[in-house]
C-alpha cells in the first residue's frame, strides 16, 4: 500500500532578500559632456547616502617587458597613495567560458552573408568557438572597477548635540509645513552634484593621471545590465524601473514600474543560501577568502602577475576575483605594529630565560619593524578584502574546483573556502550592498596591507585586445579572445610573417571570409606552384560565384580600364580618379625605365607620362569609347573597342605634348626628344610582346567580383613578372576605388621589390591607401626583401601597423630583431611556433604598435579543409 505522508508541524521563518541589499534607485548624471551611471544606496535612515560608480578598465597588459613592468608598478604604487579617505574601491575580474557575444556577432554576419558558401564557413567558425568555450580554452576576462562616494548624514555633519537637535527640529517643522518632498528632492540634487564633483571627477583623474589606466565610465544602462546579468544570466535585462536623472536642467525622475528595483532584480530567480554555497540561476557558487599573503615575490613582474597566474590556468574557469580596498588610519596601524614589537620582544626575552628560541616572535618583530619603516618612508596602509567566487553546475564539481584554487596558493599564502557565511560574503560582492567586503557585525576580517604590497593583490592584469570584432585569436596566456578588426573606419595594414607551413594562408583566409561576409571586396595577388595550384585556388572556387581565380598568363587585363566610381559622391569620385591616374602613371614609368636609367632622364619621363595620361583621359573620343564599352559590358562589340595601351601610344608624340609642357616648370627641353623616344620604344615593345598583348587588349575577366585572385604563373623573366604584378595592382586599385572599403592581399615575392618603381607603388598604397579605404595585407617569410628596398621598403614596413609573426627559422631571428627592433628574448620564442596537430592551432606573436601578445589561431575545421594546400591534403580533398 502507498505509505501515508505524515503532517509536518515544523515552521520556517524566511527573510526577504530585498532587505539585504541597499539599492534605492539607479542614477544617470549627464553633466560636463559626460554620461555616467551610478547606484544610489542607503542602508537605513540613520546611515549616510552612498553612490557607487563604475568603470570598465583595460587593466595592465599581461605581456610587458621588464622596463615596462617597472614603470607600471611604480605608477600603481604611487597612485594608491592618493586614494580618497573614507571611501572604498572594488576591483572585479571575471573569467567565464562564455561565447554569447561572439556567437551573436557571427550570427548577424551569417544572416548578412551574400552566399551560402560564406555562411557555411562562418557556421564552421561558430562551431569551433563553441567547442573552445566548452573545453575552457576560450575564456573572456573582464575587469570592472566600482568606487564609492559617501555623503554624510545630517547627524554626522554636526559635532555638537545641540546642533543635531536643532537639525532634527528643523526637519520636523519642514514636515509639518508639507515641504518635506521638495526638501528631499533638493537634498538629492545636492547629493548627486556633490558626488559628481567631489567623487566621480576625483576618481577619474586618479585613474587617468596617477594610475594611468585606460578606463571607460559605465552609464546607467551598462550598470543595470551588469547587475542583472549576475543575478539573471539567462534572461534579457528589463527596463530600469526607477531612474534619477541629473543634468543641467536639474533633477528628474523616470518611473517605468511601481515595483521596486530590488524586487524585480530577483523576480526570475531567488538565490538559495547555504552555509557553504549559494545557488542562483542554475549554478552553485562557493566563496573563498584570502587569509594571508605570500612571504614575498621574486620581482615586480611576479608580484603584478600573482593573481593573474592563478586565474590564467586552463583548469581555472568560471571564476571571479573581488578585491576591495579602503585607506586605513596610519596612526592606528603604527600603534598596532608597536604593540606587536613589544609582544615579540617580551616573548623573545621569555624564551631566552628558558634558554629557548622563539622563531615566530623574531619573525613577527622583524616584519613589524619593516612595516613601520615603510610607513615612515611614505607607504600607505589599506584595509583589504579579497574574495574568490567559483561557479559550477553541481556540488561535486564545485568542491573539486574550490580545492584546486586552495591548492594553487602555497604557504604562507593562504586561501580558504568559507563554510559558514558564504551567502553573506556573496551578498557583499554585489555593488548594491553598502557593507564592506569581509566585515561583519561580530568581526572585521579584512587584512591590512601596505601600498607597496597591493599591486600583487589587486587583479589588474588582463590581455589587451586591439578590437572587439573581426578575426579572433586566443591569448596564449589565459585564453582571452584577441580581435583584429580591419573593417572599421580607421585603416589598418597587416604584415603576416612566417616560414613555409607556418599557417599564413590559413590565417589570411579567415580575414578574407569575414571581408566577404561584410561585402568588402578583396583582391589577392598570388604566386602559385608550378602546377598552377595554390592556397586560394580551391578557396576562390569554393566561394564562387563571389570568387574568381585568374591566371594572368591565359587572360587579358586591360591596363587602361577605368574604375567604376558611380557609387561614390562627385567629390570622392574625382579624388579617387586622380589617385588612379597617379597610379597608372607609375605603372607606365615602371614599364618604360629600367634599373640603370639616369635619374634626370627618369624625372623627364615621369613628367611626360603624367601629362600624356591627363591628355588621354581628357580626349572626347576616348571618353565616348569608354562610355559605350562600360555601358555594353564585358564581351560586347563595344567592349572590344575600349581604349587600351595601343591608343595611349598614339598620344606619345611631340605634337601632342608640346602644348602640355608649356605649363610645366623645370622641364629640360633638350631631354624631351630622348625621353619621348624611350617611351615610344618601350611601349611599342610591350604592345607587341606576349605579356604586353595581355595587358594592351580588352579585359577578358569580370572585374566586379567580390574576390579577385590574380595568379602570376609561367612568367620566366623578372621584368615580365614585375609588369604583370603592376597590372594586377592596377586591377586591384580599380576594384578598391569602386568601393568605400576593400582589402588588397599581396603574397610577397622576391621579384616584386627588386624594382624600385613597384616598391614605390606598394609604399603608396600602404601610406595613402587607408584614406581610400584600402587595407593592405602582405604575407612573407621574412622582412629582408622589403627592408632591402631602401627608404621605400622602410616606409612599407613602418605602415604595417599590425604584424603577426608565426614560426620563423632560427637564422631569421636576427633579422627580425634588427629590422623591427624586437627584443631577442621575445622574437626567439617564435622559433618554437610549430603548428599543433592535436589542438589544431597555430601560434602567433601579435605586434600592435609595440604591444606584444602571444596568441593562437584556431581555424574552423571547414576553413582549414578549404585552404589546405599540401599535396597529400589536396589529394584527400579531391576525393570529396
For each of these PLM feature ranges, what is it?
Residues 56-64, 383-392, 492-498, 510, ...:
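Glycine- and acidic
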Residues 57-59, 95-97, 149-153, 392-394, ...:
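Short, flexible loop/turn elements at secondary-structure junctions
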Residues 69-84, 328, 426-481, 527-529, ...:
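P-loop NTPase motor domains
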Residues 134-136, 486, 494, 570-628, ...:
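P-loop NTPase motor core of the ASCE superfamily
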Residues 143-147, 521, 706, 742:
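The start of beta-strands in P-loop NTPase/AAA+ ATPase cores
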Residues 348, 478-483, 487-502, 507-514, ...:
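Conserved P-loop NTPase motor cores
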Amino acid at each position: 500500500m502507498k505509505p501515508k505522508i505524515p503532517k509536518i508541524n515544523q515552521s520556517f521563518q524566511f527573510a526577504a532578500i530585498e532587505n539585504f541589499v541597499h539599492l534605492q534607485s539607479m542614477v544617470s548624471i549627464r553633466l560636463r559632456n559626460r554620461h555616467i551611471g551610478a547606484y544610489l544606496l542607503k542602508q537605513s535612515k540613520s546611515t549616510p547616502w552612498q553612490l557607487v560608480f563604475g568603470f570598465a578598465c583595460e587593466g595592465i597588459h599581461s605581456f610587458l617587458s621588464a622596463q615596462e613592468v617597472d614603470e607600471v608598478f611604480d605608477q600603481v604604487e604611487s597612485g594608491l597613495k592618493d586614494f580618497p579617505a573614507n571611501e572604498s574601491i572594488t576591483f572585479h575580474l571575471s573569467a567565464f567560458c562564455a561565447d554569447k557575444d561572439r556567437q551573436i556577432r557571427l550570427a548577424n554576419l551569417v544572416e548578412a552573408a551574400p552566399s551560402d558558401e560564406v555562411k557555411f564557413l562562418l557556421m564552421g567558425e561558430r562551431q569551433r568557438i563553441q567547442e573552445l568555450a566548452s573545453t575552457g580554452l576560450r575564456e573572456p576576462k573582464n575587469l570592472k572597477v566600482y568606487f564609492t562616494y559617501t555623503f554624510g548624514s545630517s547627524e554626522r555633519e554636526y559635532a555638537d548635540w545641540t546642533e543635531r537637535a536643532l537639525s532634527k527640529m528643523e526637519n520636523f517643522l519642514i514636515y509639518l509645513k508639507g515641504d518635506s518632498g521638495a526638501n528631499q528632492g533638493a537634498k538629492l540634487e545636492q547629493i548627486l552634484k556633490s558626488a559628481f564633483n567631489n567623487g566621480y571627477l576625483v576618481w577619474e583623474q586618479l585613474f587617468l593621471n596617477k594610475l594611468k589606466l585606460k578606463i571607460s565610465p559605465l552609464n546607467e544602462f551598462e550598470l543595470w545590465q551588469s547587475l542583472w546579468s549576475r543575478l539573471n544570466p539567462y534572461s534579457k535585462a528589463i527596463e530600469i524601473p526607477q531612474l534619477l536623472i541629473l543634468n543641467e536642467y536639474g533633477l528628474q525622475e523616470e518611473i517605468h514600474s511601481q515595483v521596486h528595483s530590488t524586487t524585480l532584480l530577483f523576480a526570475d530567480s531567488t538565490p538559495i543560501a547555504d552555509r557553504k554555497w549559494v545557488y542562483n540561476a542554475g549554478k552553485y557558487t562557493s566563496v573563498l577568502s584570502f587569509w594571508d599573503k605570500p612571504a614575498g615575490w621574486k620581482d615586480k613582474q611576479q608580484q603584478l602577475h600573482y593573481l593573474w597566474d592563478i586565474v590564467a590556468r586552463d583548469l581555472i574557469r568560471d571564476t571571479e576575483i573581488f578585491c576591495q580596498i579602503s585607506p586605513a588610519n596610519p596612526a592606528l596601524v603604527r600603534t598596532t605594529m608597536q604593540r606587536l614589537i613589544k609582544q615579540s620582544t617580551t616573548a623573545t626575552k621569555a624564551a631566552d630565560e628558558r634558554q629557548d628560541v622563539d622563531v615566530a616572535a623574531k619573525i613577527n618583530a622583524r616584519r613589524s619593524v619593516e612595516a613601520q619603516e615603510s610607513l615612515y618612508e611614505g607607504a600607505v596602509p589599506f584595509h583589504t578584502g579579497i574574495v574568490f567566487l567559483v561557479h559550477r553546475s553541481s556540488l561535486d564539481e564545485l568542491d573539486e574546483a574550490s580545492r584546486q584554487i586552495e591548492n594553487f596558493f602555497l604557504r604562507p599564502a593562504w586561501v580558504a573556502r568559507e563554510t559558514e557565511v558564504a551567502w553573506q560574503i556573496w551578498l557583499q560582492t554585489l555593488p548594491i550592498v553598502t557593507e564592506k567586503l569581509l566585515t561583519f557585525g561580530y568581526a572585521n576580517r579584512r587584512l591590512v596591507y601596505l601600498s607597496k604590497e597591493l599591486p600583487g593583490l589587486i587583479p589588474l592584469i588582463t590581455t589587451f585586445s586591439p578590437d572587439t570584432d573581426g578575426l579572433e585569436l586566443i591569448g596564449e596566456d589565459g585564453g582571452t579572445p584577441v580581435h583584429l578588426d580591419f573593417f572599421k573606419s580607421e585603416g589598418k595594414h597587416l604584415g603576416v610573417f612566417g616560414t613555409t607551413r607556418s599557417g599564413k594562408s590559413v590565417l589570411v583566409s579567415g580575414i578574407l571570409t569575414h571581408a566577404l561576409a561584410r561585402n568588402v571586396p578583396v583582391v589577392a595577388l598570388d604566386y602559385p606552384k608550378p602546377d598552377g595550384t595554390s592556397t586560394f585556388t580551391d578557396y576562390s572556387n569554393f566561394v564562387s560565384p563571389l570568387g574568381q581565380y585568374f591566371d594572368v598568363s591565359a587572360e587579358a587585363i586591360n591596363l587602361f580600364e577605368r574604375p567604376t566610381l558611380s557609387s561614390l559622391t562627385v567629390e570622392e569620385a574625382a579624388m579617387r580618379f586622380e589617385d588612379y591616374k597617379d597610379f597608372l602613371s607609375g605603372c607606365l614609368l615602371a614599364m618604360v625605365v629600367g634599373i640603370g636609367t639616369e635619374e634626370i632622364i627618369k624625372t623627364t619621363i615621369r613628367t611626360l607620362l603624367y601629362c600624356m595620361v591627363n591628355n588621354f583621359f581628357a580626349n572626347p573620343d576616348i571618353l565616348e569609347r569608354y562610355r559605350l564599352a562600360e555601358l555594353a559590358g564585358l564581351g560586347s562589340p563595344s567592349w572590344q573597342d575600349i581604349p587600351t595601351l595601343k591608343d595611349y601610344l598614339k598620344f606619345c608624340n611631340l605634337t601632342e605634348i608640346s602644348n602640355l609642357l608649356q605649363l610645366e616648370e623645370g622641364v629640360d627641353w633638350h631631354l624631351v626628344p630622348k625621353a619621348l623616344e624611350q617611351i615610344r620604344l618601350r611601349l611599342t615593345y610591350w604592345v607587341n610582346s606576349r605579356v604586353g598583348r595581355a595587358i594592351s587588349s580588352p579585359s577578358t575577366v569580370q572585374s566586379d567580383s567580390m574576390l579577385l585572385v590574380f595568379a602570376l604563373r609561367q612568367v620566366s623573366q623578372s621584368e615580365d613578372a614585375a609588369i604583370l604584378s603592376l597590372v594586377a595592382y592596377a586591377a586591384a586599385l580599380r576594384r578598391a576605388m569602386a568601393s568605400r572599403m576593400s582589402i588588397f592581399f599581396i603574397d610577397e615575392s622576391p621579384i616584386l621589390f627588386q624594382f624600385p618603381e613597384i616598391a614605390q607603388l606598394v609604399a603608396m598604397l600602404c601610406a595613402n591607401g587607408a584614406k581610400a579605404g584600402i587595407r593592405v595585407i602582405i604575407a612573407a617569410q621574412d622582412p629582408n626583401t622589403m627592408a632591402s628596398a631602401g627608404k621605400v621598403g622602410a616606409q612599407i614596413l613602418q605602415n604595417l601597423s599590425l604584424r603577426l609573426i608565426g614560426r620563423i627559422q632560427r637564422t631569421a631571428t636576427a633579422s627580425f630583431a634588427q629590422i623591427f627592433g624586437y627584443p631577442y628574448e621575445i622574437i626567439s620564442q617564435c622559433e618554437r611556433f610549430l603548428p599543433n596537430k592535436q589542438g589544431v592551432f597555430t601560434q602567433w606573436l601579435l605586434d600592435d604598435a609595440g604591444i606584444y601578445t602571444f596568441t593562437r589561431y584556431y581555424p574552423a575545421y571547414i576553413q582549414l579543409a578549404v585552404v589546405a594546400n599540401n599535396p597529400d591534403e589536396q589529394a584527400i580533398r579531391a576525393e570529396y
